[in-house]
């Protein structure tokens, strides 16, 4: 029962009352003197995966926090099972499937937060080091890979100059195609995440805090000075925003001179912490992606390979990729150029992407000094335009060949045409194997159409080769290239179902007997109607671009293509 003190005038004893034998009212034994200068300790902090306001980026940050705690545990107690309580100075952290709990150990939160951030965000030899992104006990990446991963963070989370401090430029030497190359990267002495615990502490004390653009790359305040449009974070949200640097995977976008990051929202924090180190690119060429679609599928594929494709849904929920690039109206910072979000991971989509990525890998190329300069050679990562096209279709749940007839690169080059010095083609000779690798992922009717076009092409080119057998090689080559160009323009220029049918009929009639066409005419006919004529046009150009000849005419075509490809690679 609570002590009750006398109220009103009765609470002030009269001097005569003591003389009359009345005692002064006793002070309540439960009452304690309160020091107004001493702050009460905040309650333990709990981060819940499905709490209101937890966006995919913040959920990815919760996964990054779990991965960092696992790295700290592995460093301090290698034999401890995961998940076990993680000691952070006076406090501890505990990871559950859908929550992370931080206890301050009876001390001010500052000591616990300092220990957590100090062990999670480091700089080694000028390069950013995030232990949560590496397997426990794994050796450090080679210098050229560490520099590339460092640069990927610079063009995503740490692009603003105020987010980093100090540091000298680092020179790294390694070999590409048995030739020494040198790459320079700006090193850092520190970066903003190392002291961001102060913002979390502010949120614990006053209820919320504001974070700069490094917490949400590519985002901006809609109306500067209008408070209702300003993003504010609770303590749990701020902590997740800080560790999004670990939970997300950052890539470089060489073609756009920008970057991309993928926020993988976990459904199981314990399991995600085990899988996160496997998402970090292990090869230099894998640090680059062709776009946001390539980034989201690349991250999902690696996660599926680590967890198993059939079990991926038990670990991963929403996946969101953001491509950042410079825009004409903002030269200082890269802003969002594309966002790709997938709420479900389809196994058949990952199978198709895996085939495309294997056949069309990014490649390292030596960049020679321009003109007569005698400087040192550097390198660049060459990105396949065809891979970018295929991955955009796959990420959008479209057939991988959709709009092959009309798709262009950012420079206005056509995806369906082979590149040469004097044309607007984008394909390179070696990318033909990428088209061939995707043939098994066509429907039955689509495959019959492609094969019927291949047979017709073989007949036409064989006839041209026979007609020019006694002619000069240049004459034969020009005839073969001219026929292929005529067919390409005929298919690409078709704008109606009638024009598509006319272009195909012209090819088939010139080629003579076509066994595939005769046996599967009813199947092919489905593609020539008003509903699917665009698909037929795309597939005809896929067949033309993926055609591999036999005998002499194959050599002529390949020589011409290799000459064009060599001019692009040099």
Curated annotation (Swiss-Prot):
UniProtKB keywords: Antiviral defense, Fruiting body, Sporulation
Any one GO biological process: defense response to virus
Region entry Disordered, spans: 1-23, 551-570
Induction field: Part of an operon going from at least MXAN_7266 to MXAN_7259 that includes a CRISPR operon with transcription continuing into the pre-crRNA locus.
Top-level taxon: Bacteria
InterPro entries according to UniProt: CRISPR-assoc_Csx13_C, CRISPR-assoc_Csx13_N
Keyword hit for Transport: no
UniProt note: phenotype after gene disruption: Decreases sporulation 1000 to 10000-fold, aggregation is delayed. Delays for C-signal-dependent methylation of FrczCD and impairs fruA transcription. This mutant should not have polar effects on downstream genes.
Family: Belongs to the CRISPR-associated protein Cas8a1/Csx13 family. Myxan subtype subfamily.
Function: CRISPR (clustered regularly interspaced short palindromic repeat) is an adaptive immune system that provides protection against mobile genetic elements (viruses, transposable elements and conjugative plasmids). CRISPR clusters contain spacers, sequences complementary to antecedent mobile elements, and target invading nucleic acids. CRISPR clusters are transcribed and processed into CRISPR RNA (crRNA). Functions in an unknown fashion to stimulate transcription of fruA independently of the intracellular A- and E-developmental signals.
Listed name of the protein: CRISPR-associated protein Cas8a1/Csx13
Chain's gene name: devT
């Amino acid at each position: 029962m609570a002590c009750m003190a006398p109220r009103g005038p009765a609470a002030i004893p009269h001097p005569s009352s003591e003389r009359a034998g009345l005692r002064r009212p006793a002070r309540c034994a439960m009452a304690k003197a309160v020091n107004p200068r001493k702050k009460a300790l905040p309650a333990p902090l709990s981060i819940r995966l499905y709490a209101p306001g937890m966006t995919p980026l913040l959920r990815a940050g919760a996964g990054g926090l779990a991965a960092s705690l696992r790295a700290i545990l592995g460093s301090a107690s290698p034999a401890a099972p995961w998940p076990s309580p993680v000691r952070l100075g006076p406090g501890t952290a505990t990871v559950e499937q859908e929550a992370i709990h931080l206890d301050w150990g009876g001390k001010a939160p500052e000591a616990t937060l300092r220990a957590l951030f100090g062990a999670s965000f480091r700089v080694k030899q000028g390069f950013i080091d995030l232990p949560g992104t590496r397997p426990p006990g794994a050796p450090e990446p080679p210098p050229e890979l560490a520099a590339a991963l460092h640069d990927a963070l610079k063009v995503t989370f740490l692009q603003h100059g105020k987010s980093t401090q100090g540091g000298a430029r680092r020179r790294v030497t390694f070999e590409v195609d048995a030739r020494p190359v040198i790459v320079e990267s700006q090193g850092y002495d520190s970066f903003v995440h190392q002291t961001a615990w102060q913002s979390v502490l502010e949120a614990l004390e006053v209820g919320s805090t504001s974070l700069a653009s490094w917490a949400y790359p590519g985002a901006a305040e809609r109306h500067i000075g209008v408070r209702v449009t300003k993003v504010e974070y609770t303590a749990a949200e701020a902590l997740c925003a800080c560790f999004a640097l670990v939970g997300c995977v950052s890539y470089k976008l060489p073609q756009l001179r920008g970057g991309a990051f993928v926020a993988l929202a976990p459904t199981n924090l314990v399991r995600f912490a085990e899988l996160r180190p496997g998402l970090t690119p292990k090869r230099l060429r894998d640090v680059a992606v062709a776009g946001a679609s390539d980034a989201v599928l690349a991250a999902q594929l690696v996660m599926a390979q680590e967890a198993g494709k059939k079990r991926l849904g038990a670990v991963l929920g929403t996946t969101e990729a953001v491509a950042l690039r410079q825009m004409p109206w903002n030269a200082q910072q890269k802003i969002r150029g594309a966002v790709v979000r997938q709420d479900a991971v389809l196994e058949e989509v990952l199978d198709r992407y895996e085939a495309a990525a294997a056949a069309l890998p990014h490649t390292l190329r030596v960049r020679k000094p321009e003109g007569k300069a005698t400087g040192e050679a550097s390198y660049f990562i060459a990105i396949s335009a065809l891979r970018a096209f295929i991955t955009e279709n796959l990420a959008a749940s479209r057939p991988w060949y959709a709009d092959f007839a009309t798709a262009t690169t950012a420079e206005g080059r056509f995806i369906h045409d082979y590149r040469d010095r004097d044309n607007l083609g984008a394909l390179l000779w070696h990318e033909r194997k990428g088209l061939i690798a995707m043939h098994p992922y066509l429907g039955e009717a689509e495959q019959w159409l492609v094969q019927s076009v291949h047979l017709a092409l073989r007949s036409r080119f064989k006839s041209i080769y026979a007609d020019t057998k006694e002619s000069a090689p240049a004459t034969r080559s020009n005839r073969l290239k001219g026929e292929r160009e005529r067919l390409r323009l005929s298919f690409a220029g078709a704008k109606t179902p009638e024009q598509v049918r006319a272009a195909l009929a012209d090819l088939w009639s010139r080629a003579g007997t076509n066994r595939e066409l005769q046996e599967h005419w009813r199947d092919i006919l489905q593609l020539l109607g008003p509903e699917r004529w665009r698909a037929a046009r795309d597939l005809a150009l896929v067949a033309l671009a993926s055609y591999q000849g036999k005998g002499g005419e194959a050599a002529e075509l390949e020589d011409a293509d290799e000459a064009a490809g060599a001019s692009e690679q040099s």
